[in-house]
Amino acid sequence: MNAAASSYPMASLYVGDLHSDVTEAMLYEKFSPAGPVLSIRVCRDMITRRSLGYAYVNFQQPADAERALDTMNFDVIKGKPIRIMWSQRDPSLRKSGVGNVFIKNLDKSIDNKALYDTFSAFGNILSCKVVCDENGSKGYAFVHFETQEAADKAIEKMNGMLLNDRKVFVGRFKSRKEREAELGAKAKEFTNVYIKNFGEEVDDESLKELFSQFGKTLSVKVMRDPNGKSKGFGFVSYEKHEDANKAVEEMNGKEISGKIIFVGRAQKKVERQAELKRKFEQLKQERISRYQGVNLYIKNLDDTIDDEKLRKEFSPFGSITSAKVMLEDGRSKGFGFVCFSSPEEATKAVTEMNGRIVGSKPLYVALAQRKEERKAHLTNQYMQRVAGMRALPANAILNQFQPAAGGYFVPAVPQAQGRPPYYTPNQLAQMRPNPRWQQGGRPQGFQGMPSAIRQSGPRPTLRHLAPTGSECPDRLAMDFGGAGAAQQGLTDSCQSGGVPTAVQNLAPRAAVAAAAPRAVAPYKYASSVRSPHPAIQPLQAPQPAVHVQGQEPLTASMLAAAPPQEQKQMLGERLFPLIQTMHSNLAGKITGMLLEIDNSELLHMLESPESLRSKVDEAVAVLQAHHAKKEAAQKVGAVAAATS
């Protein structure tokens, strides 16, 4: 099969210079007119999932891909011209340098398209790119031809030509290694000498007189500022390398006018930057090796701990070279560093001090890591989690729910911490039993829905949704976590002139509630967790029970242990008698409205009479506002009927 696949003609395009917001759908809309598209992939960062600025478009026919390359190259998508070329999966062909041309001294106005149009006359171009930064073109570019012959022809014709009134250099592309080798060879035969740290009294003539003793000089220059003042450095160019080398050997470190001068080979800016970078990396590696295994990171520090106290706490374990609490605006940031003289001392300090309470907080002590190491470690952890999820068999998610009592599904394996459970549409359908509340008291949109997938949010407030012309509110809803639900039961009960049937049954059910004891789970109830594995849950302290006269005390554990369809019933049985003492005529309506609130909030209301009264007052205000609006509408209707 591989042999057959390799014989297929190329029909894959690389699309670069993409805007970060460009998606596969946009590219499909762009490229599908050229012909049938098999697939499109925008390459993204593994962690952030942000676009990397390029994509691959695979066509069914090579002719369609070629048509797209010819007609759509440099078209604009979301304000940026795209760059299209044939996808070359073999990196050795891209990096070989065959057919690759380097152009420099370009005018800022020349972009990818202008460069492509200029050089396409010499042969088929595989890729063409002007190098840019945030300020625009950097003045150089690369053109990769299909053949070396086309590249040689372009170099011969274009090198030294004027493009936008600027003489450009066009030559064969050279790798960094080749360029460094050439610079090294030139450095060995240098003739230009750099001199610095001399006084202001030294001018061109005195500098020439000083250095001409070593051989014939071609030029001597002291560098000056716009005011003509010497900058304290200059250059001397010799005719022969031997003379320049002799000047460096004899003059470097000599004293002139009370100052010790530096004399060395004159370097280009690129060389100096490369040398400084090498020195910086060398110092960095030395520092890393020096502090490897001896520098400790301590966090969760008490605010009263300063550098001296930190040193005092860790000094029993060995010789401390430095101890520092990190500060911000003079206040402790809660972490610091302690550096020991040997790895053995640092290891002992970690063993003894990690978890020890100093001041009022337990310390976290570990070997300090560089930012790059921490980032790599976190990335590795993330990738392992992703790989573990992908390694699950296809039916793992579908089979992770086993039937429990009442036809509900509970997880057969623990869910990932902090993540909401995943349910397939079929499972959701199975999880909706016939509602216990035949009329009212349950929102239509959330009948039988387990609390694990109900959206949570801040404390709810009652709001009024567009009523109809019936005798009482057609739709009264609770705003919980940004979602509203219709109270159809209130409509039914009000149209019949009574209270909801389910609410009417609360009082009789309350009398026999104590006869039906429920299992108590060893964990605290939370609206986002349902039926976790009891073996992995820590035991909790006894929880306060909500006492309603004549009923079994209700705890969060009892509520969590009950099937979801019974939880609202249990809460309603305890809410109804409390609300009836406040507003006996509206108790049924208000109870049905309050049952839309999240279970944890309802438990809080049962424990706090002030909170319950506040919510009841809100519900009464909504009902009264609706009643007033309905009366006003009836009066308007009566007046209209009389006038007609």
Swiss-Prot record:
The modification Dimethylated arginine is found at residue 518. The modification Phosphotyrosine is found at residues 140, 364. Gene3D superfamilies: 3.30.70.330, c-terminal domain of poly(a) binding protein (1.10.1900.10). Residues 436-459 are annotated as: Disordered. The modification Omega-N-methylarginine is found at residues 419, 432, 436, 454, 530. Its main location: cytoplasm. The modification Phosphoserine is found at residues 206, 315, 319, 531, 584. The modification Phosphothreonine is found at residue 304. It is found in: Cytoplasm. There is a cross-link at residues 361, 375 (Glycyl lysine isopeptide (Lys-Gly) (interchain with G-Cter in SUMO2)). Residues 11-89, 99-175, 191-268, 294-370 form the RRM domain. Identified in a IGF2BP1-dependent mRNP granule complex containing untranslated mRNAs. Interacts with NFX1. Interacts with ZFC3H1 in a RNase-sensitive manner. This is Polyadenylate-binding protein 4. It comes from Homo sapiens (Human). The gene is PABPC4.
